[in-house]
């Protein structure tokens, strides 16, 4: 790889999520389907409480928490499926996403062509300087 930074590295990208850390994507998904993280937290809470009840020796409480854990897992899976069905049924949203992807691809292609043209100009300038240098050396 080249030590020189690419012109793509200047932050002109249309897709800001491309450079964002993973937790922004997680937050975005949580906003889209808020029941899934709540179900995960409830499942973890029930699991922790069941482990605590087992440690104390309260078998009845542990069994209730195991049952609650299974119920919360089921509700979480149902929320996942429901969210997938809800977001999967919107063809307009899919069409908009495809259009955004096409626009992003065209933008990236344009940036790549500009980058290639810029590099080509740099190579031509280097060749001109090298030819001028050689000509100066020959004159000496």
From Swiss-Prot:
GO process terms (BP): mitochondrial cytochrome c oxidase assembly; mitochondrial respirasome assembly; regulation of proton transport
What membrane topology does this protein have? Answer: Multi-pass membrane protein
Compartment(s) of residence: Mitochondrion membrane
What does the UniProt keyword field contain?
Membrane, Mitochondrion, Transmembrane, Transmembrane helix
Q: Which domain of life is it from?
A: Eukaryota
The record lists the membrane-crossing segments as 35-54, 66-88
Checking PROSITE patterns in the record gives:
HIG1
Chief location of this protein within or outside the cell = mitochondrion
What residues does the HIG1 domain cover?
7-98
Does the UniProt entry include the keyword Transferase? no
One GO cellular component term of this record is: mitochondrion
Q: What family is this?
A: Belongs to the RCF1 family.
User: What's this chain's function?
Assistant: Cytochrome c oxidase subunit which plays a role in assembly of respiratory supercomplexes.
Its assembly, as annotated, is:
Associates with the respiratory chain complex III/complex IV supercomplex.
Q: What is this protein called?
A: Respiratory supercomplex factor 1, mitochondrial
* Species of provenance: Yarrowia lipolytica (strain CLIB 122 / E 150)
UniProt lineage: Eukaryota, Fungi, Dikarya, Ascomycota, Saccharomycotina
